[in-house]
Structures are given as structure tokens and as C-alpha cells.
């Protein structure tokens, strides 16, 4: 899978598609296809292209104007991709996805089935966020994480983020002359996260922050990811010839498709704060039971994705909760045997069953290093 940023695809001055660059990319993709590889593309650029055709001022667009620009730009981008790929007898298809399409299990599976069918028919899917219907609260916010979610959805072997940077450094190389290049990452440790220059929260923004968040989704799903320079023509060819790039290698034991979907969920609807005993039980593979929960935050329904954090706020896990928020609050601190008396019906013993629970990779590494929670 290849992710193409707006700055690579669209000339920032004129607002036109960089046709020569796109033709060179199409040649590289045609070569990959000739070698028997399936290719998917996640493409930005619709708003930038549409803004020009609608004569809208950059930096001053309202939400409705951005949505209009996206609608106009999608047609131009689709035409550009179809034109350059037709030179190689390759069909393309456009998929517009929203955050909810990846968070809702049924819609996620429907989108995955569509991708699989297109690939079986020899078509290259070109995917973008559906900016015409999304708002700031219900969007990916960047195509790095969209690309990672789709790579997970399509069971891709690798995701290549073509960018204006050539990989990960220990610090910003433009500001720190002693910054060292990192060619390979095998685990997203706190040290690696610190290199992004900001916290890796689900709502994190900024170039390297979103790329590391995308890497976490990919690695947990068993998909390798690369950050590679893409400004020059034939970026993929240069990459294969040994050009500089940072590879994030997947976990040795990738999660099941269901757990990878839970782990990759970007929108947690609530937070459960748990004590040290519960944290140790989670690390040992147990379900989350009511006695170990101290606080329930948020308003959510049964089956919602929630975060599980320690008393110090450190991330422990993400899971699908078995009770709505009002009932979960009633169960806090109580034994599982008290559930029927508290709720008036006999519910599940656990708030989150271990089959619906995924440990945070940072918590797993802390536990393996002997730095887990202690009483």
C-alpha cells in the first residue's frame, strides 16, 4: 500500500496536480504489478485541487467550503489517476471512507470485502477520507492513520508513507545537527515515541506524531511500514534501489483480525481507571473485572471501545466494554457476584472480556522489562 501526501501530488503554488510526478509513479506501480504485487493507494490532495477550481482562498475556508472543495477536487484527482494508469492498462476505483467506517465493525467488514473484490478483479483502489461529510470531531484528521487503518483492513504486507522527509531521526534534523537517522524500528518504545517531539495520543497531530501512530496500528496488525522520501520522480524505484528510509517492522506474533481492529480503533468513547492489582491481572492475560476498577469516565453504550489506564494515567489497554456507562459506574469496586443485586439482572462477570481486550504495546514492553505496576 502506498500513501501519497498532498504536498507531493499537488503543486502548492498553482494548485494543479503534478502530472509528470504522477506519471512516473504510475510507471513504478506498473512495474510492481508486473512482478505480481497487489497495490493500493491512499491519496490526499482533493481539497487542495478543489480549492483552486472553486477560486477559494487558502487558509480562510470555512468547513462548508472545505467540504465543497473536497467534492470538486475528488473528481479531478480521480480523473488524474485514471488517466496515468490507463497508459499501463490498469483500472482504478475510488473509495471514500470516514472514521466511522473503520470504527463500526460491520461497515469495516463491508469496506474490507469491497477492497478484496477490487483486488481480485485486478483494480487498484484509490482511497481518501470522505471530507465532504466529515467534521473535525468525526474524522481521521490525517491520511497517515487512514492509510494504516486501510492497510490493516486489507491485510497488506507493507505500507509506504511517501513524504517530504526521509525517515525518523532522534531529533529534528533541521534544528539539531547531531540528530541521528534511525533506519529500523522494531518496537515503539517511549524513547522512539519521544523522537516525535510530542505525545502519541489518539488525537495527536503533527507530521511525525501521526506517522508513529500509524506505525503502531500497522505493527500490531502484522504489517511493515516505511517512511520514505517521495518528492522526486520515480520515488518507489529509488526506494527499491536502496534510498534512505525508516522501516517499522511488525510484531512477531500479529494480533488476530478482531484484536487488530480493536487495537486500531482511533475513537475511544470512555476511560476506565484501574488499580495496580487489575493492571497486573491484565498483563497476565485476565479479563477486566469490576473490583479492580476505580473510576469510569465518559458516556457510552454496551460494546463501545474504551481505554483502560492505570492510576497514574498510563495507557494499559483498549477493549469493548460489556456494559453501558451508567451500569459500569454502579459496578465499580464490587465483586462480580454482586452484579445481579446491583443491576437487577444477571450480566457478564467481567466488564471487558479478555477476548475483547488488547494490551497497549507500551504496557506490554514495560511489563516485559519488569517495570509494570507494583502495589
Curated annotation (Swiss-Prot):
Domain PUA per the UniProt entry, residue ranges: 269-346
Binding residue positions for ATP: 3, 163-164, 205-211
Pathway per the UniProt entry: Amino-acid biosynthesis; L-proline biosynthesis; L-glutamate 5-semialdehyde from L-glutamate: step 1/2
Entry keyword annotation includes Transferase: yes
Keywords (A to Z) from UniProt: Amino-acid biosynthesis, ATP-binding, Cytoplasm, Kinase, Nucleotide-binding, Proline biosynthesis, Transferase
Name of protein: Glutamate 5-kinase
Domain of life (superkingdom): Bacteria
Protein family membership: Belongs to the glutamate 5-kinase family.
Zinc found in the keyword field: no
Summary of the function given for this chain in its UniProt record: Catalyzes the transfer of a phosphate group to glutamate to form L-glutamate 5-phosphate.
Cell compartments where the protein resides: Cytoplasm
Gene Ontology cellular-component terms listed: cytosol
GO-annotated biological processes: L-proline biosynthetic process
Amino acid at each position: 500500500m502506498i500513501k501519497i501526501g498532498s504536498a507531493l501530488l499537488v503543486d502548492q503554488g498553482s494548485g494543479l496536480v503534478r502530472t509528470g510526478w504522477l506519471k512516473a509513479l504510475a510507471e513504478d506501480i506498473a512495474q510492481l504489478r508486473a512482478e505480481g504485487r497487489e497495490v493500493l493507494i491512499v491519496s490526499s490532495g482533493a481539497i487542495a485541487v478543489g480549492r483552486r477550481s472553486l477560486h477559494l482562498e487558502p487558509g480562510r475556508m470555512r468547513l462548508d467550503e472545505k467540504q465543497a472543495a473536497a467534492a470538486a477536487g475528488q473528481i479531478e484527482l480521480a480523473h488524474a489517476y485514471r488517466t496515468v494508469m490507463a497508459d499501463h492498462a490498469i483500472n482504478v476505483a475510488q473509495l471514500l471512507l470516514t472514521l466511522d467506517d473503520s470504527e463500526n465493525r460491520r461497515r469495516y467488514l463491508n469496506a474490507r470485502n469491497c477492497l478484496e473484490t477490487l483486488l481480485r478483479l485486478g483494480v487498484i483502489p484509490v482511497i481518501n477520507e470522505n471530507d465532504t461529510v466529515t467534521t473535525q470531531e468525526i474524522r481521521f484528521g490525517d491520511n497517515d492513520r487512514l492509510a494504516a487503518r486501510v492497510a490493516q483492513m486489507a491485510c497488506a504486507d507493507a505500507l509506504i508513507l511517501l513524504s517530504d522527509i526521509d525517515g525518523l531521526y532522534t531529533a529534528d534534523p533541521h534544528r539539531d545537527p547531531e540528530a541521528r537517522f534511525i533506519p529500523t524500528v522494531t518496537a515503539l518504545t517511549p524513547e522512539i515515541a519521544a523522537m516525535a517531539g510530542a505525545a502519541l495520543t489518539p488525537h495527536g497531530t503533527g507530521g511525525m506524531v501521526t506517522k508513529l501512530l500509524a506505525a503502531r496500528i500497522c505493527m500490531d496488525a502484522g504489517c511493515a511500514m516505511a517512511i520514505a522520501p517521495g518528492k522526486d520522480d520515480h520515488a518507489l524505484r529509488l526506494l527499491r534501489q536502496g534510498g534512505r528510509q525508516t522501516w517499522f517492522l511488525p510484531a512477531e506474533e500479529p494480533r488476530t483480525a478482531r484484536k487488530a481492529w480493536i487495537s486500531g480503533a482511533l475513537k475511544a468513547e470512555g476511560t476506565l481507571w484501574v488499580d495496580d492489582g487489575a493492571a497486573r491481572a491484565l498483563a497476565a492475560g485476565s479479563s477486566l473485572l469490576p473490583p479492580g476498577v476505580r473510576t469510569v469516565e465518559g458516556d457510552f453504550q454496551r460494546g463501545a471501545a474504551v481505554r483502560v489506564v492505570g492510576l497514574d494515567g498510563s495507557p494499559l489497554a483498549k477493549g469493548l466494554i460489556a456494559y453501558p456507562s451508567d451500569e459500569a459506574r454502579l459496578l465499580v469496586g464490587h465483586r462480580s457476584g454482586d452484579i445481579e443485586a446491583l443491576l437487577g439482572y444477571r450480566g457478564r462477570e467481567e466488564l471487558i472480556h479478555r477476548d475483547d481486550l488488547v494490551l497497549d504495546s507500551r504496557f506490554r514492553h514495560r511489563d516485559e522489562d519488569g517495570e509494570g505496576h507494583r502495589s
